Amino acid sequence: MEKMNYLLPEESGEMTLSGITTLRKMEQKLRNLFESQNYQEVMPPNFESVELYTGLDAGFEQEKMFQFINHEGKSIALRYDFTVPLARNFALSELKEARYSYFGKVFRKEKRHKGRRTESYQVGTELLGLSEVTGDQEILGLTFMTLEALTLKNTIVEIGSAAFFKRLCELSGGDAPLFSELLEKKSLSGMKAFVDKHEMRGAPRDLLLALMTTTDLPTMKKLVLATGDEKLSQALEMLEALNLPDKTAICQIHYDFAMVPAMGYYTGLMFQVYVEGVAQAVISGGRYDKLLKQFGKTTGSIGFCVHMENVMKGLNND
C-alpha cells in the first residue's frame, strides 16, 4: 500500500488559528463600514461559465482559469473575478444605481514564487450607475475609510489612469507589448533604449522618459501639454478633477503615470495601495465603464478589492 501524501498542494491557502481570528475581526470591521455607506453585501456563485470571462474584451487569460466540463458538457470555471458577475447582474437588472460589497475567494493559476496565491481571499466593493468624477470620489473616499478600519500604517495610495496608459500605447510606435512591459518593470534603461530605437525626439521623448520618475500632476501636465496630444490631456484632466491632496491623516497619495492596468477592463481611474514591508498591493481598484457596456448597459462603474492575505502581512509587520 502506497504511503499517503498529506502535504497541501501548492495551490492551497492555509491560515493559522490566530490568523483566522484576526481575519474575522477585519472582516467584521469592513462589513460594518460598507453597511454604514449603504453597500449591500452580495454572494456571487463559486462557479461560472468560462464563456462569461472569455466572451468579454477584458484581457482575461483563459490558461489561468480552473476549468472543468459539467454534466451537460459545458465548460465551467471556478470564480476568477468578482467584478464581472456583479456587473452582469447589475446590467440585467432594472436598477439605475447600485452599491455592492462582497467577501470570498477567487481562483487563478499563478506561477510559483511570484508572491501571489492561486487561492486568494478578497473583500471588495462595486459602485455602479454614478458619473465618473462623482463615482471616483466616492470610491476613493471609501478606500481611505477602509484603510482606517484596517489600521494599516505607512500606506501609500498610487493613482493612475487606464485612459492615459492606453493612449501612450497608441503612441508607442506599434510596439505596445514591449512598451507595457517596460512600464510594468519600471525599467528606465529599457525606456531609454525604446525611445532611441523608435527615434523619438522632442516632447514625446521627454514625456516617455519622465513617466517613471514623475509623481506630481502639474509636472506631468506640462510634459503632456508640450506634446499637444488632446487625449492625454483629457485623461489628466479627469485626475485633476478629483482634487486629491498629497496626503491624508492615514496615507500618502502619489501619482504613478507608468501604472499598467491590473485588469484589462479598466478604462479610467485606477489605483493601488501599498503598505511598508509588503511587495504586493493591499488594495487595488479602478473604473470599468466599457465592461458594463458589453452587457448592454451604458453607465459609470468603479470598484476596489482588498487583498486580505496582503493585509494580514501588513498587520504582522506593524
From Swiss-Prot:
Pfam families in the record: tRNA-synt_His
Compartment(s) where it occurs, according to its Swiss-Prot or TrEMBL record: Cytoplasm
Entry superkingdom: Bacteria
Any GO BP annotation: histidyl-tRNA aminoacylation
Keywords per UniProt: Amino-acid biosynthesis, Cytoplasm, Histidine biosynthesis
An example Gene Ontology CC term for this record: cytoplasm
Coiled coil ranges: none
Annotated metabolic or biological route of this protein: Amino-acid biosynthesis; L-histidine biosynthesis; L-histidine from 5-phospho-alpha-D-ribose 1-diphosphate: step 1/9
Keyword Signal set for record: no
Gene Ontology terms, MF aspect: catalytic activity, acting on a protein; histidine-tRNA ligase activity; transferase activity
Family: Belongs to the class-II aminoacyl-tRNA synthetase family. HisZ subfamily.
Quaternary structure note: Heteromultimer composed of HisG and HisZ subunits.
Miscellaneous comment: This function is generally fulfilled by the C-terminal part of HisG, which is missing in some bacteria such as this one.
Protein's job: Required for the first step of histidine biosynthesis. May allow the feedback regulation of ATP phosphoribosyltransferase activity by histidine.
HAMAP family: HisZ
Listed name of the protein: ATP phosphoribosyltransferase regulatory subunit
